[in-house]
Design a protein with these regions (language model features):
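Short hydrophobic core segments
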Residues: 1-4, 151
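Active-site substrate-recognition segment that forms the wall
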Residues: 3-31, 35-131, 212-220
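Short beta->alpha junction loops/turns
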Residues: 114, 139-140
Length: 220
């Protein structure tokens, strides 16, 4: 259920819904790809705290995404954010900054969705043997790979198979619950603004900000 876990009884504070948004360029001509590279369809990202990620697509586009859409009070979900928001414009600006060769390319697609985020940003897998209820989730945007691993781990737990998967740290892990509102809204919004400020400061000074450790303690 990930971000929609908020709709289950008693689970409003288990995961918060945070948006991850993406854009895609038109197919780029070969001369532009000669400047960019990515001949092997590599994924790319960097170490900024406001996460970004991208990939060359099979049809020659760049698909590029990141965070930045504001958290909605009370764990709200607004589907309009997924297709049209100022956060998309900021993602496009970041793409142009990171890969200037894309500045003249049309942006043909904008989309997004909500992620399920635990309080400590750590996914978990588990099985309650008394009830037979298993769970897996809190992938924070890494679900394509993590859900596959979680499914195989759950299969071993259900069949009581001891394996290297069932000894992983996320098995049986329980994240603490998110703070009640309005503390949740204040904390997430303030953390996002602090992360943006730290990114700007580190870009300007070319060294780790002293506030980075403060943000890490707040997030975890």
């Amino acid at each position: 259920t990930e971000a929609y876990t908020r709709d289950l009884a008693g689970q409003r504070r288990t995961l918060v819904p945070l948006y991850s948004l993406m854009v895609a360029t038109e197919p780029l001509p070969d001369e532009v790809w000669d400047r960019i590279g990515l001949r092997g369809m590599e994924l790319f990202a960097d170490d900024r705290r406001m996460v970004i990620y991208g990939q060359r697509t099979v049809d020659g586009r760049i698909a590029f995404g990141g965070r930045g859409a504001p958290y909605r009070y009370g764990s709200g979900i607004d589907t309009a954010t997924e297709s049209a928001s100022g956060a998309h414009d900021r993602i496009v600006a970041t793409l142009h900054e990171l890969i200037p060769a894309t500045r003249d390319a049309r942006i043909t697609h904008r989309w997004g969705g909500v992620l399920g985020v635990p309080r400590d940003w750590r996914p978990s897998v588990g099985l309650d043997r008394a009830t037979g209820l298993g769970w897996a989730g809190g992938y924070v945007g890494e679900g394509v790979a993590a859900a596959n691993l979680a499914g195989r781990t759950l299969a071993d737990l259900v069949t009581a198979t001891e394996s290297e998967l069932t000894t992983l740290d996320w098995v049986g892990h329980r994240s603490r619950r998110w703070e009640p509102e309005p503390l949740r809204w204040i904390g997430i919004g303030g953390g996002r603004r602090l992360a943006e400020w730290i990114d700007r400061q580190e870009e300007r000074r070319q060294r780790t900000s002293r506030l980075a450790s403060v943000l890490d303690r707040v997030v975890r």
